[in-house]
Amino acid sequence: MEFEAEHEGLTASWVAPAPQGGKGAEGRAGVADEAGHGKTEAECAEDGEKCGDAEMSALDRVQRDRWRFSSPPPHSGVTGKGAIPIKGDGKAIECQELTGEGEWLSQWEELPPEPRRSGNEHLDESRYAKQTERGSSTGKEEGDGMKQMGELAQQCEGGTYADLLVEAEQAVVHSVRALMLAERQNPNILGEHLNKKRVLVQRPRTILSVESENATMRSYMLVTLICSAKSLLLGSCMSFFAGMLVGRTADVKTPLWDTVCLLMAFCAGIVVGGVDSGEVESGETKSESN
């Protein structure tokens, strides 16, 4: 496939053969112009010498640029994707387009221009414009860019960072799935192995567990208060009705006897209420233990 250089006006130098000499000798010999009018032999020689020197200097530059920017040899390892593209400051590269970077850097002192396909297929104009503006960079920046590019080329041989990241993510997902499957199938065996592997197994206290404990304590205190109020109310009622019944049956007019009966009924009510509350509390402890 034919490539075009189009770098600093060197399109002709990409395909043209190396110059085999200039026109300075012909100028010095006094060759006249094509028309052959209005000039003597000395004037023709002088003009030809000046023109020949100018053309020789331009051709020397073209020959030098041709040596620097010519296409890579067939054994260099560079495929049809072309030379190594440079972005922005000349330091960032694309790993997927590095094919023969080692041999290329060993044979060429500078990076060649980015070639363009003859049909302009898949052409990124902005990247090419940035690449053509690279002429203002200094030699030190170019050396640093080549060194960094060599390091990135070595890293790209074993896979890019994206590939390594994807492999790590897949390994983590696989490990989590295997752990979940083992915990579902054999939770006891898994717990035993974990207890053997770990020095101290502690279950961390989360915010949810702390709030649950606080709610349990509040509910327990509320139940205890309700049971105590129930016992007091029941004892008071029993003592009141027992005092009325005992007072009518004995038919005693003394207030001392009424007071004694009232105290006895009150004590009996307290005892009955305490037994009732104890049964409730024992039932709660059994439910909590279960």
From Swiss-Prot:
CC per GO annotation: membrane
InterPro entries to which the protein is assigned, alphabetical: Herpes_pp38
Region of interest (Disordered), ranges: 1-49, 67-87, 111-146
Membrane topology (UniProt): Multi-pass membrane protein
Biased composition annotated in UniProt, kind: Basic and acidic residues: 34-49, 113-145
Transmembrane portions of the chain: 226-246, 255-275
Keyword Nucleus carried by entry: no
Subcellular location: Membrane
Protein keywords: Membrane, Phosphoprotein, Transmembrane, Transmembrane helix
Residues annotated as signal peptide: none
Post-translational modification: Phosphorylated.
The keyword Flavoprotein is annotated on this UniProt entry: no
Principal subcellular localisation of the protein: membrane
Domain of life the protein comes from: Viruses
Extra remark beyond the main annotation: Expressed in both lytically infected cells and latently infected lymphoblastoid tumor cells.
Protein name: 38 kDa phosphoprotein
Species name: Gallid herpesvirus 2 (strain MD11/75C/R2)
